[in-house]
From Swiss-Prot:
The lineage of its organism: Bacteria, Pseudomonadati, Pseudomonadota, Gammaproteobacteria, Cellvibrionales. Pathway: Amino-acid biosynthesis; L-tryptophan biosynthesis; L-tryptophan from chorismate: step 2/5. One of its GO terms (biological process) is L-tryptophan biosynthetic process. Binds 2 magnesium ions per monomer. This is Anthranilate phosphoribosyltransferase. Mg(2+) 2 binds at D226, E227. Belongs to the anthranilate phosphoribosyltransferase family. Pfam families: Glycos_trans_3N, Glycos_transf_3. The gene is trpD. Its cofactor is Mg(2+).
Amino acid sequence: MDIKQALKKLVASIDLSTEEMISVMRIVMTGGATPAQIGGFLVALRMKGETLDEITGAAMVMRELATPVNIDVDYLVDTCGTGGDGANLFNLSTASAFVVAAAGGRVAKHGNRSVSSSTGSADVLEAAGIKLDITAEQVARCVKEIGVGFMFAPSHHSAMKHAIGPRRELGMRTIFNMLGPLTNPANVKRQVIGVFNGELCKPMAEVLGRLGSEHVMVVHAKDGLDEISLATETQVAELKGGEIREYIIKPEDFGMQSKSLIGLSVSNAEDSLLLIRDALGNRRGQYAEKAADIIALNAGAAIYVSGVAGSLSDGVEMARDAIGSSLAGEKIRELAAFTQYLQ
């Protein structure tokens, strides 16, 4: 199937099969489509609504074309959101990664610069002095020696260069927001993934099951966050042992009070980093305690999924301990120093 045939089907609201999606994505990712065709394809796919088969096929192609990172460690996990929730919260999944590492987990963090929000994970890490342009082998060293390593998406998904222009010009979430968490170059089998729509929780878990994941939590909060929220209930689809369980969690389940998200939005990477450092440090700012609580909820989920904690409640408690001891904040400085040392 060529991209023109795919566009005709999508405009007519006809779903593509996994095989058809694989064919079209190979064209897109190998330079066989024009920017106009790529933009039209992404918009038509979004307007129709992406199906399980379409997401799976696209993820398979991106994995096939990725530059892999080989990391042989226990308790390896990724924390990643799809973005596109419009909340412009500080980089919560990035902050959570350092807490997980401080609690004994290992994080192979996959991310990029901002596309649809005020700041992406790469932006805030760069602001912290963490070197992004490192090899796959150096990423593996970071994970093994510091407990957390960052895989800058353009370095591992070079085929994405063909879609970068159309994505930026569209300025809205597309299927590529979903593909980021599904295409971790370290082939991580354990993940906490936030999605921009609650209807995606179970399908994303199902796609990851098809792709070989072992333990995954896919989350979406009722206030629209692609994270576990401190303000309201959060919908969860948990893949474990080949089965998917759906349930609802809320801050009170973990001994926390629900709090509004006022003060947790940022306009740039520097503001995001300041709030993260305050939350993981002395917590002197007006919103630092609130930020620390929401980080603990999300990091706790990753600690649980990694296998370090036996339950979600235990994971949240371990996250709070790691934050309170300032070990998590120290991990940011350790990773910055280590990456600058790498040659």
